[in-house]
Amino acid sequence: MARIAGINIPDHKHAVIALTSIYGVGKTRSKAILAAAGIAEDVKISELSEGQIDTLRDEVAKFVVEGDLRREISMSIKRLMDLGCYRGLRHRRGLPVRGQRTKTNARTRKGPRKPIKK
């Protein structure tokens, strides 16, 4: 297994799909990385040489991925919460942030229903 950005990339998958196992790399970014590295999308990871894997590592290193991306996102949310702005309050209360209705629906964000105690 090739190791890129601290993640074991599955060998049996095509390069485009295999790179999406890295947090922060979707299909579009995966295609861009492969184009910059000069590698075909339909090649399996097991068929790549060490040199090609090294170029993939270098291309992935140009982006914010994995732990750094997770940290950046959590710091952004924490900043909103510390500011006390509307979006920060919604994050703090565990409610939808982007204006969705909450009288009905929003169950994913609010969690399971709590029974009314009599």
UniProtKB/Swiss-Prot annotation:
<dbReference type="GO" id="GO:0000049">
    <property type="term" value="F:tRNA binding"/>
</dbReference>
<keyword id="KW-0689">Ribosomal protein</keyword>
<feature type="region of interest" description="Disordered">
    <location>
        <begin position="94"/>
        <end position="118"/>
    </location>
</feature>
<dbReference type="GO" id="GO:0002181">
    <property type="term" value="P:cytoplasmic translation"/>
</dbReference>
<dbReference type="InterPro" id="IPR010979">
    <property type="entry name" value="Ribosomal_uS13-like_H2TH"/>
</dbReference>
<comment type="function">
    <text>Located at the top of the head of the 30S subunit, it contacts several helices of the 16S rRNA.</text>
</comment>
<dbReference type="InterPro" id="IPR018269">
    <property type="entry name" value="Ribosomal_uS13_CS"/>
</dbReference>
<keyword id="KW-0820">tRNA-binding</keyword>
<comment type="function">
    <text>In the E.coli 70S ribosome in the initiation state was modeled to contact the 23S rRNA (bridge B1a) and protein L5 of the 50S subunit (bridge B1b), connecting the 2 subunits; bridge B1a is broken in the model with bound EF-G, while the protein-protein contacts between S13 and L5 in B1b change. The 23S rRNA contact site in bridge B1a is modeled to differ in different ribosomal states, contacting alternately S13 or S19. In the two 3.5 angstroms resolved ribosome structures the contacts between L5, S13 and S19 bridge B1b are different, confirming the dynamic nature of this interaction.</text>
</comment>
<dbReference type="GO" id="GO:0003735">
    <property type="term" value="F:structural constituent of ribosome"/>
</dbReference>
<dbReference type="GO" id="GO:0005829">
    <property type="term" value="C:cytosol"/>
</dbReference>
<keyword id="KW-0687">Ribonucleoprotein</keyword>
<dbReference type="InterPro" id="IPR027437">
    <property type="entry name" value="Rbsml_uS13_C"/>
</dbReference>
<keyword id="KW-0699">rRNA-binding</keyword>
<keyword id="KW-0694">RNA-binding</keyword>
<dbReference type="GO" id="GO:0022627">
    <property type="term" value="C:cytosolic small ribosomal subunit"/>
</dbReference>
<comment type="subunit">
    <text>Part of the 30S ribosomal subunit. Forms a loose heterodimer with protein S19. Cross-links to the P site tRNA and weakly to the A site tRNA. Forms two bridges to the 50S subunit in the 70S ribosome, contacting the 16S rRNA and proteins S19 and L5.</text>
</comment>
<dbReference type="GO" id="GO:0005737">
    <property type="term" value="C:cytoplasm"/>
</dbReference>
<dbReference type="Pfam" id="PF00416">
    <property type="entry name" value="Ribosomal_S13"/>
</dbReference>
<dbReference type="GO" id="GO:0019843">
    <property type="term" value="F:rRNA binding"/>
</dbReference>
<dbReference type="InterPro" id="IPR001892">
    <property type="entry name" value="Ribosomal_uS13"/>
</dbReference>
<dbReference type="InterPro" id="IPR019980">
    <property type="entry name" value="Ribosomal_uS13_bac-type"/>
</dbReference>
<dbReference type="GO" id="GO:0015935">
    <property type="term" value="C:small ribosomal subunit"/>
</dbReference>
<protein>
    <recommendedName>
        <fullName>Small ribosomal subunit protein uS13</fullName>
    </recommendedName>
</protein>
<comment type="similarity">
    <text>Belongs to the universal ribosomal protein uS13 family.</text>
</comment>
